[in-house]
């Protein structure tokens, strides 16, 4: 999928944001992939360590993913500037580290010619599976409409839960939305972890909500012009951009970018 075409006004807003932030358009697109890998990493953490892992930065990062998942739509996201959706670079720190780790690991040849990191196997597997599922989901108009409709419903319900996107009822709704869309497709994404967590309903809901946020990040990445082959042929450029983004993260005040209300 080539970069989706948007209105001149929307593109101008992106150009202005990029100029003011010092981030390039390629780096802006990469942040969507970072969000996908963050969702994959948090899915792994939830499945192996339970909801207790959602403290401090992990909780903040999870929150940012969930909020953004409600603002990424079939035709056009609320913003083409990634940090307008995800808040700030600190909110994506887990994804920055996860994607960089996957890219620098030794690679093995596979039939698909895609890299297979040894150490980051599960996180990488989840990310690749979500990329595949996203394309299938958004090829089905009924699924795309289901997501759009439920996003609006959840946004309304958040008013009754003090805009707490991690409220159990909201997580359950996002989990159901994932099941009703990506969960209906094959091959299904199987999550591996400890039985005590994978049999716990609140943890299951959090995992599925996290997977939905990853599905949405994958869609956002494609909207911005991302594709799987960039992971193979653009690896060096990605690493350079990730390290530049890390420098920007340390230089910028954490509160400089805030999600739109």
What are these regions (language model features)?
Residues 2-98:
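Leu/Val/Ala/Ile-rich N-terminal alpha-helices, chiefly Sec-type signal peptides and the beginnings
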Residues 20-34, 56, 83, 113-124, ...:
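Short, solvent-exposed segments of well-ordered alpha helices
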Residues 31, 35-42, 125, 129, ...:
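Charged, amphipathic alpha-helical oligomerization/scaffolding segments
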Residues 48-55, 193, 226-233:
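Structured alpha-helical bundle/scaffold domains in large eukaryotic membrane-trafficking regulators
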Residues 61-72, 153-161, 233-250:
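Short, mixed-charge aromatic SLiMs
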Residues 66-165:
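Long amphipathic alpha-helical segments with strong coiled-coil/leucine-zipper propensity
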Residues 152-226:
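Conserved binding-pocket/active-site segment within a compact domain
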Residues 203-261:
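Alpha-helical oligomerization segments
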């Amino acid at each position: 999928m080539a970069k989706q075409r948007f209105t001149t006004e929307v593109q101008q807003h992106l150009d202005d944001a990029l100029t003011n932030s010092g981030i390039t358009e390629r780096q802006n697109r990469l942040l969507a992939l970072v969000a996908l890998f963050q969702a994959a990493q948090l899915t792994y953490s939830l499945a192996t360590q339970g909801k207790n892992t959602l403290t401090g930065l992990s909780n903040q990062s999870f929150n940012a993913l969930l909020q953004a998942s409600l603002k990424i739509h079939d035709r056009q996201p609320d913003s083409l500037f990634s940090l307008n959706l995800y808040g700030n670079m600190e909110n994506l720190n887990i994804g920055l580290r996860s994607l960089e780790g996957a890219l620098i690991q030794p690679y093995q040849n596979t039939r698909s010619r895609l890299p297979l990191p040894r150490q980051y196997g599960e996180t990488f597997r989840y990310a690749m599976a979500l990329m595949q599922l996203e394309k299938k989901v958004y090829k089905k108009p009924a699924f795309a409409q289901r997501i759009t409709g439920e996003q609006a419903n959840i946004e309304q319900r958040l008013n009754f839960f003090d805009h707490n996107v991690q409220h159990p009822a909201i997580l359950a709704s996002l989990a159901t939305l994932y099941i009703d869309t990506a969960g209906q497709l094959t091959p299904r994404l199987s999550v591996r972890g400890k039985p005590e967590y994978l049999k716990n309903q609140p943890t299951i809901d959090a995992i599925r909500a996290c997977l939905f946020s990853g599905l949405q990040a994958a869609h956002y990445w494609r909207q911005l012009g991302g594709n799987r082959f960039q992971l193979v042929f653009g690896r060096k450029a990605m690493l350079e951009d990730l390290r530049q983004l890390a420098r920007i993260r340390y230089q910028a005040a954490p509160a400089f970018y805030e999600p739109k209300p």
